[in-house]
Swiss-Prot record:
GO CC terms, sorted: cytoplasm
Cited InterPro entries: ATP-grasp (IPR011761), ATP-grasp_RimK-type (IPR013651), ATP_grasp_subdomain_1 (IPR013815), RimK (IPR023533), Rimk_N (IPR041107), Rp_bS6_RimK/Lys_biosynth_LsyX (IPR004666)
Binding site for Mg(2+) 1: D255, E267
Superkingdom assignment: Bacteria
Protein name stated in the entry: Probable alpha-L-glutamate ligase
Molecular function (Gene Ontology), one example: ribosomal S6-glutamic acid ligase activity
Domain ATP-grasp: from-to ranges: 112-294
EC id: 6.3.2.-
């Protein structure tokens, strides 16, 4: 197969592992930055064209056809990355997470709404408009309060407000800067830990418990967190698969938390990192992703 990976940083661990696994299985793979693409629409055939420019001084060239697409772009490239995914979906090319599912997962509030609609428990959450009083809005959520920007990954854009006064101050400041925030209950009993479930297709292929640094409420690897192996219950496996299906994803990193209220889904990531979970679990997740693509291509 001829594969295309959409990625801004090809040297990242996840991109390199996927490249190695694809090539080891006999596939050709290109790694391209979606922000260097140009999409063209025309009333005359061909109606859809995709060009690529290696750098600002180079001559753009028309990209060839591909058999499958692997999206690995970050939140800052979501708009262009999803436009490229839609281009390929229009041409009936298999995308390992298409643009529709990707956009659902990348919008934190929308994803919480969709999960809740399907009866999947999430932390108590609230979203207020720019003209709604921050002082009144924050009363809907417990204190301490988690504040999150609607788009972001790797723990970036997540703030713990220790009291209502600081929460209101943060909300008012960021609202003035046109940065909307969602509010969530802080689950204190979790003590800075969560469970990452890596889902491919209809199977949870790997898991780990993530542990935040001392005095750090975020358990993300990129925030200095560590990880250890963990055994999932059958209920947790079912929940991770249900959350993945709810957003229409083929591949997902589902973050769960064990709370006094029961199991909660914190987030569903459409482009989950491989490094920490491969090293913790000892499972070759990159290979399983390539095998999943092969199975879809043979259908």
């Amino acid at each position: 197969m001829k594969l295309l990976m959409l990625c801004r940083e090809p040297r990242l661990y996840s991109c390199q592992r996927l490249k190695e696994s694809a090539e080891d299985n006999g596939h050709q793979i290109d790694i391209l930055d979606p922000n260097r693409c140009l999409l063209k629409l025309s009333k005359n055939a061909p109606h859809f064209e995709l060009y690529y420019q290696v750098n600002s001084k180079s001559e753009p060239y028309l990209l060839p056809d591909y058999d499958a697409i692997i999206p690995r772009f970050g939140s800052t490239s979501t708009r262009m990355g999803c436009a490229v995914l839609r281009h390929f979906r229009t041409k009936n090319v298999f995308c390992l997470n298409d643009d529709v599912a990707f956009l659902k997962a990348r919008d934190k509030w929308l994803s919480l709404q969709l999960l809740t609609e399907q009866g999947i428990a999430v932390p108590n959450s609230a979203l207020s408009g720019a003209e709604f009083s921050a002082t009144q809005a924050i009363l809907q959520i417990q204190s301490p309060t988690i504040l999150k920007t609607l788009h972001g990954s790797q723990g970036i854009g997540v703030i713990l407000a220790e009291n209502r006064k600081s929460a209101v101050s943060i909300m008012e400041t960021l609202t003035q800067a046109d940065v909307p925030l969602l509010m969530q209950d802080f689950i204190q009993e979790a003590q800075g830990t969560d469970i990452r479930c890596f889902v491919i297709g209809d199977k949870v292929v790997a898991t780990m418990q993530r542990i935040g640094q001392e005095d750090e409420f975020r358990a993300n690897f990129h925030r200095g967190g560590s990880a250890e192996k963990i055994q999932l219950t059958e209920q947790e496996k079912v929940l991770a698969l249900k959350a993945t299906k709810c957003l229409g994803l083929d591949v997902a990193g589902v973050d769960l938390i064990r709370s006094k209220q029961g199991l909660l889904v914190l987030e569903v990531n459409a482009s989950p990192g491989l490094e920490m979970i491969e090293k913790t679990s000892g499972i070759d997740i990159a290979l399983q992703m390539i095998v999943h693509i092969e199975k879809q291509f043979k259908r």
